[in-house]
Amino acid sequence: MKQEFSVKGMSCNHCVARIEEAVGRISGVKKVKVQLKKEKAVVKFDEANVQATEICQAINELGYQAEVI
């Protein structure tokens, strides 16, 4: 599945790298691309292994505000 997430609170490329690294480590995530200027993340993942809510939670735990769009 491919899902877009709104991500608020990012200010630089380091923020992008932190999110991509953290989400990329989640079992079932195949690809993650974070876009700083658009304040969003696009994640491809296997729904059998992970849910969109878990991805949001991982981003939120880093101190950003994520939600499914």
From Swiss-Prot:
Q: Where does Cu cation bind?
A: C12, C15
InterPro entries xrefs: Heavy-metal-associated_CS (IPR017969), HMA_Cu_ion-bd (IPR006122), HMA_dom (IPR006121), HMA_dom_sf (IPR036163)
PROSITE patterns listed in its UniProt record: HMA_1, HMA_2
Tell me if Metal-binding is a UniProt keyword of this record. Answer: yes
Keyword Chaperone attributed:
yes
A GO CC annotation recorded here is: cytoplasm
- Briefly describe its induction: By Cu(+) and Cu(2+).
Which ranges carry the HMA domain?
Answer: 1-67
Where is the protein found, in the record's own terms? Cytoplasm
Q: Pfam family example for this protein?
A: HMA
Q: Which UniProt keywords apply?
A: Chaperone, Copper, Cytoplasm, Metal-binding
The entry lists its GO molecular-function terms as: copper ion binding
Q: What does this protein do?
A: Acts as a copper chaperone by delivering 2 Cu(+) ions to CopY Zn(2+)-bound form. This transfer results in displacement of zinc and dissociation of CopY from the promoter, allowing transcription of the copYZAB operon.
Under PANTHER family, the record lists: P-TYPE CATION-TRANSPORTING ATPASE
Q: What is this protein's record name?
A: Copper chaperone CopZ
Q: Which organism does this sequence originate in?
A: Enterococcus hirae (strain ATCC 9790 / DSM 20160 / JCM 8729 / LMG 6399 / NBRC 3181 / NCIMB 6459 / NCDO 1258 / NCTC 12367 / WDCM 00089 / R)
